[in-house]
Structures are given as C-alpha cells and as structure tokens.
Swiss-Prot record:
HAMAP family: FTHFS (MF_01543). SUPFAM superfamilies: P-loop containing nucleoside triphosphate hydrolases. Pathway: One-carbon metabolism; tetrahydrofolate interconversion. It is an enzyme of class 6 (ligase). It comes from the Bacteria. Pfam families: FTHFS. It comes from Streptococcus pneumoniae serotype 4 (strain ATCC BAA-334 / TIGR4). It catalyses: (6S)-5,6,7,8-tetrahydrofolate + formate + ATP = (6R)-10-formyltetrahydrofolate + ADP + phosphate. This is Formate--tetrahydrofolate ligase.
Amino acid sequence: MKTDIEIAQSIELKPIVDVVEKLGISYDDLELYGKYKAKLSFDKIRAVESNPVGKLILVTAINPTPAGEGKSTLTIGLADALNKIGKKTMIAIREPSLGPVMGIKGGAAGGGYAQVLPMEDINLHFTGDMHAITTANNALSALIDNHLHQGNELGIDQRRILWKRVVDLNDRTLRHVTVGLGGPLNGIPREDGFDITVASEIMAILCLATDIEDLKRRLANIVIGYRYDRTPVSVGDLQVEGALALILKDAIKPNLVQTIYGTPAFVHGGPFANIAHGCNSVLATTTALHLADYTVTEAGFGADLGAEKFLDIKTPNLPTSPDAVVIVATLRALKMNGGVAKDALTEENVEAVRAGFANLKRHVENIRKFGIPAVVAINEFVSDTEAEIAALKELCASIDVPVELASVWADGAEGGVALAETVVKTIAENPANYKRLYDNDLSVQEKIEKIVTEIYRGSKVNFEKKAQTQIAQIVQNGWDKLPICMAKTQYSFSDNPNALGAPENFEITIRELVPKLGAGFIVALTGDVMTMPGLPKRPAALNMDVESDGTVLGLF
C-alpha cells in the first residue's frame, strides 16, 4: 500500500476554478494562491447568504488512541461518498498546525484515498493564515511591552499580564521565558511565555468572527491583563484592534481546496479541541451550508470535547444546527478503552471490544442529549477481525444506533457509500431537535457542573483556590454569562488521561479559569493540559525531507 503522500502525489489535481464551478463560484469570486488553492471573496460570501441552508453533518469520535481514529479521513471520505450517491456536498474542516505535523502526527489532511489536496501545502504553510495569526498575536505582545516601556499610561500591572506570545511549533522550552532583559533600552523585564499558535485567542476569534467588523469587535474585547487596581485592560483600551484586524484581513477569508475525488473543501482555522473550541471557522461552515445541499464538518478529539464545544459554543453562531452526528469508532480504540495495552491493540480481543463499548455508548447517549440523531462509523483497519466487527454491530443494535463499516482510507468514496446512505436515511427519518446542554444564564460553577456531570459523568467538581478567586473576578466584571470551554485531556471522560473506558463517580478539579472575551467564552483548565506541547522522543520531523526538484518526503 502506498503512503499518504505517495497517494497524494499520484493524483492529477484539477484547477480549483474548475472544482468550484459546480457550486456557482466563478474565477472572479476567487483569490488564487497558485492553481490549486484559493480564498473566497467577501463579495461572494455575502452574495450566497440568501441561498437556502443545506443539511449539516458533524463528525466526531470516541476517546482516541494517541494516533487518532481517522476522524478527518472519515469526514473527507463521507463527503466524497455523498457526492458519489448524487448529493451536492462540501467539506468544512480545520487547517493542520505545523507543531503536531512535525511532532507526532506527520500530517493532518486525511489519509489514504480520503485526503484533501495539495496535502503538502495544507500541512505546511498553506495560504499563510497560521503565520498571520502568529504575527497578529505577537504584534499585540510587542504593543503591550512598548506601552509598558513608554510610560504605562494605562497602569498595567506587569505581574498580571495574561497575554502570551505564540509560535506554530511544539517547543516546551518556551513555556516560561523572561523578556525585557539587557538594561533600560530593552524594555521592562517581566515573566512571559509562549503558547502554540492554535491555542491563541486570536485563532478562536478568527474561527468565530462573521466579518471584518465582527473581527474588530472581538479583537477589541480581548482582555490582555489587569491594572494595579485589578480592573481589566483590553485591546480596545490599547486602541490597536484596527492594526490587528489589518494583519488578519486576508486570513479571515475561507480557503478552498479539493479532495482526491474532486469534492470542494473549505480548510480554514484550526483551534485545538483540548485547549480551545476545536472547530473550523463559522464563516467557512456557514458559506458551505449556503453553497451545498450537505456540509460535512468535524470537531476535534472525542465527542466529550470537540462535539460538546461545537454544539454549545459554535452552533449558536451558525444558521442551523447539525442534522446528524457521525461518531467514528475504531476497534483498536475500543480495545484500548476496554483495557488492552497499546502494543496489543492489533490482536483479536472480542471481550475487550465489548468492554470498551461502554465508551462509545456514552458518547451516543451524550449526542442524543442534544436532540440530534447519531450514526456510528467503524473506521476499518487491516487488523480488524470479522468476530470483532460482528460484536460491535451487535452492541450498536442493542442501543438502537445505526452503524456502518467504512473503508474510505483504502477504498476512497466507494468505501463510504453505505455510511453515506445510512446518514442520508437517518436525517430523513429522524429530524433533529437541537437543544444546548446549558443556559448561559447559569452561574459559572453550574455550567461547569452541568458539563462534568451530564457529559463526563463525574460526581463532583472541585475548584482550587485560584479558580475560586477568578470566578469572583469574573462575576464582578459581568463575564459570568459566557459559555464554558473546557480544557481537558482527550483520552478520558475524566481529567485523568489513564482513566479509560467509561469511568463514573470521579471528581474533576478546576485549577484555573481564563476569560476569553474576544472569543466569547471562559476557558476552564483541568489536570495538566498544556497550551504549548512538547515534541516526542522521535518526532515525525526526523523522517521528513525535500528532494532537489522540490518533491516533499515524509509527510503521512
């Protein structure tokens, strides 16, 4: 079997102008980045707003193994299959972060015969959006430090600056740094740190903003820190939201590419789901809904993280809610959640599949709490056995959830036809009745408790002293009506990454609460979740190279 990059490089791409013609998009509507990538103009985005709204399919997953369960691959393959059965379909997914690409993932543009192309460009610098977000973020840091150096007219307490610098790499050495050293000419010394770009609030803002004016409003609302009198300081106080928006004026426009089978795809924005809201841009998803009859999108990690945030944070900003949720399950992840060691996941173990099903069952129950029908997609691997597949299908039947085997990685669009037909049938026969998990008028504690007890199935939430102080500050400033964005391990329903399966009666500890007023939510930090990842012992970068003719090697 060819590698992902070998498959991608064997495909003859169509000019992006030809790919999007069937959507009613012309050459004049595009801002081209070469022959195969483009941004969609704001004029076209506004022109299609009066079009009917299509069906929305959200793809999520069970709690994953470290390698991931192929959610992006399934998203792409399902869209290709929907087009194959005659449904006018678009994809709306996130742009990969270079950090994980160089670290553990080696690429994040799908896999096998279910990829978005050109995958090398998408995984590397693409249209420059990540760099624009990085630059805007760090421009704000420079402007803050300059304000301190030039007399600090706003009275900013340099010990209470929340804003950090960012870089789109995994670099643990940058988590805590000191800036302004070297004497009076080099600024005011203070503690600082770096996050990964996709953890920046500006990334979340870009993915939730609806136009330039909304972008500026959200940027102005960013709280960068506090004064000596403990009152908040915003970007609006610094009067630099216009400059930041200027840096982002092109990055806010959605990017258009294609799949191996020529399905048009928006790839735009990329916040992590364990430390941010984990969804592609509202602008891309909304525009896709106006252009196609079906839009397939995804939310990061398991349904306890990405899907909950999609439904509680992103959906209220969309013209419609999901008509169906596809939960991706793999037998290896079920076996891991059933207690099997990572090095034994390829061995047949029907009992472990049965034990791990408790994890999938809980995700199905949780999606149903939002009033949306669920469909289970078994992402097929060569190590799967007939006995394991039969056991999983039997278990899904026991909770009355449709289930289909999908082999889109190996077989492309054809391998997703059965899943596509089941999803279309489910949408037709089971209309969604979407409802949010909580009301924003609940207190901060009540909203967190609702997520922990109803989605994670924990018994209690403990708030550390720092978090309690921050809640009081949030209430005092009138920010307590914002939704909650949980920062939690992706491997477990709990805040303990080793508590696999479907743990119950556990307690979750909230160590810190960070107001993200520009994004419009409050981040609740649990466990040891890092906003700047580190590299593994053997990074994927060690296998990467480029030949003299520019051919890329080692992405997968």
